[in-house]
């Protein structure tokens, strides 16, 4: 057999099928952008659904790919078995109504057995087929020459996921030899059984039937081929190693972990071997997922990443690694995969930062969490129960960042289980609290009742006009149809034509008025009705508004003008964030009002001051360049080909609205915008903050609001300069001078305090008492803080040579206590930490520390003298 690397096998597969007329489909992102049914891309065919279901006709009906994939349904098995992975590559060849069984089988056999390609010994290959698939049997037996005893008929060789395309499949197995099993009395020792000897190499699915709703099967007019070969498994066979982890796709990460830990892989310790495997698998998954735009969080795919990283950190402790280290493996993954996935090395710095940040977050709470979990397990055992309560599991998740699955693994090792239902109940309570906190009492929350029945047409024309002649086509009051609204009454209405924008896409609704003879109606808010019309929330200020009334609908143009400036500014900001922070930045939410804009985006850490400055400057430069804003309607595929940014998770129709700011920004957006960036005037960032793991928020203002903000800041600067008796341009010099003066005064003050402390310490030596042969000093002193107290303690210990000393000071009703024990007395059982804890407890406080020096605090200054009196009792108790 040839000696090949994993990278060579991958390339060889693609080259082979390219020679057979296949188009090579690039590996798609792990984050599915067109399939909301998937959390991750989990197979080679997952990205080709659009071709198989007919939504898109491929240029070439023959396709081959090497698709990176993630499956996380059995994370707990990773590391325990030879071939379970969360990240893997699936090699496949596909036919969309072109060739079928004969070509698929012939080419698979050629690729595996030809000396030009893999070069397997034909005698070591067996195949399985469906019992009724005589066509496949004939091809294997008569054309490929596979003896009938190596063609096994299995009922499970039928691919069916319910309604839709289905069909039989054939699998090819490689015999690894007797070293992996020679007990032929084992009922599982056959190709297709659960064993380590016969490994599945390739699965060929023949989609030839349609599974109908009534359960029947009818032939498909166009038959398809869908095959899959796991690269990791194939590599383990070619490289003749016992598990996938022993291939060159994993060993570099395992080797790097050996270097970091000082431990050895395959050194006879199965528990440590499992840790090496878990780390190698999980870092591959996290590296690729972060590179494709996913970030750790507590929801969805972000939760999967958090769980994987924290599981790896947990296993790293078995290798005596007690610090963040996974981030150091990111460039190792990049090197292994660089031939086919060069983007990993290109993004390695960013990916490593994300991983390190997440590791550091977990390490901060890991120790405390493990201690709490140990207490929970101990308590459960005392109570003779083998179940960890849902409340405790939720506390570990919510406070210490322990994914429920991690708690379950710890519990399993202790012979216990977790009350998963109780945990989910606690999670739901938290979600309810969050939902209650988010509710906006001013928004139109309820749109049920008669609103769901209203299906009259309503056309929005507000992109191009700010006022229209309209008719009231529906009127609702108190959730019921109404014929009229009187002055002072509130209601909801629809217009046949409206210039009022309904709140959506982060942009707030227009406000304004409806006017008619003797009638004036304030439009307070506009939302989408259940059937998609613009629903206006109104208050009648004058007259009576009737259904079918003709009105003039006029929006507040001043308000709209401010809103559109802020909306276009969010588009400029989005692109500037990508330019400065990286292409991983994606919009996570926004709010566009007339006063300000708020933009939430994915990013792993705080945006630095210099980065914010750069972002702000870029946006302003684009404003000052006076760029025209062009808006057009495009087919969704055309818009994506243009590179238009789509908001992840949003559903778009076949035709979309594209907002283009010159050649700088291109987004799909249904909102209102300026005609030219110059209209925005100026852009000023007000704040940047984190609103959750992996999500940041920028708040900013534009136009008049930005001018007023800057005016206020200049006013404050002038006021500060006046108080410092200087002018604004010299204020920094003046501040530096004041800091220097303060520093000098602090130095002089500390020097003076030290002298006074020394004097007081000298005086205190006269107060030393001898208790059972031990020098004891317990005194209340006048010093400013704990630092001065320590200085005095050092002086006294030096002067007395052998003593137990406790000093206390009171400042602003706060008690500081310091205990010291000289070295000679520590060996006799005296302990400063234990002593100071007892003293502090007698004046309402607590503390502790080392045997030679310890500090504490108290809350009751009036009890200090009484507390200090205890010192003599303590010395007597130890000397007995």
From Swiss-Prot:
Give the Pfam families listed for this entry.
DHHA1 (PF02272), tRNA-synt_2c (PF01411), tRNA_SAD (PF07973)
Chain residues that bind Zn(2+): 567, 571, 669, 673
Can you say where in the cell this protein is located?
Cytoplasm
Indicate yes or no for the key word Lipoprotein.
no
| Assigned keywords, A-Z | Aminoacyl-tRNA synthetase, ATP-binding, Cytoplasm, Ligase, Metal-binding, Nucleotide-binding, Protein biosynthesis, RNA-binding, tRNA-binding, Zinc
GO CC term, one of those recorded: cytosol
Give GO BP annotations, semicolon-separated.
Answer: alanyl-tRNA aminoacylation
Q: How is the cofactor bound?
A: Binds 1 zinc ion per subunit.
Write down the InterPro entries for this protein, in alphabetical order: aa-tRNA-synth_II/BPL/LPL, Ala-tRNA-lgiase_IIc, Ala-tRNA-ligase_IIc_anticod-bd, Ala-tRNA-synth_IIc_core, Ala-tRNA-synth_IIc_N, Ala-tRNA_ligase, Ala_tRNA_ligase_euk/bac, DHHA1_dom
The reactions it catalyses are: tRNA(Ala) + L-alanine + ATP = L-alanyl-tRNA(Ala) + AMP + diphosphate
Enzyme class, UniProt record, top EC level? ligase
Annotated EC: 6.1.1.7
Molecular-function GO terms, alphabetical: alanine-tRNA ligase activity; aminoacyl-tRNA deacylase activity; ATP binding; catalytic activity, acting on a protein; transferase activity; tRNA binding; zinc ion binding
HAMAP family under this entry? Ala_tRNA_synth_B
Record remark: domains: Consists of three domains; the N-terminal catalytic domain, the editing domain and the C-terminal C-Ala domain. The editing domain removes incorrectly charged amino acids, while the C-Ala domain, along with tRNA(Ala), serves as a bridge to cooperatively bring together the editing and aminoacylation centers thus stimulating deacylation of misacylated tRNAs.
Its annotated function is as follows:
Catalyzes the attachment of alanine to tRNA(Ala) in a two-step reaction: alanine is first activated by ATP to form Ala-AMP and then transferred to the acceptor end of tRNA(Ala). Also edits incorrectly charged Ser-tRNA(Ala) and Gly-tRNA(Ala) via its editing domain.
> What's this protein's family per the entry?
Belongs to the class-II aminoacyl-tRNA synthetase family.
Q: What is this protein called?
A: Alanine--tRNA ligase
**What gene is behind this protein?**
alaS
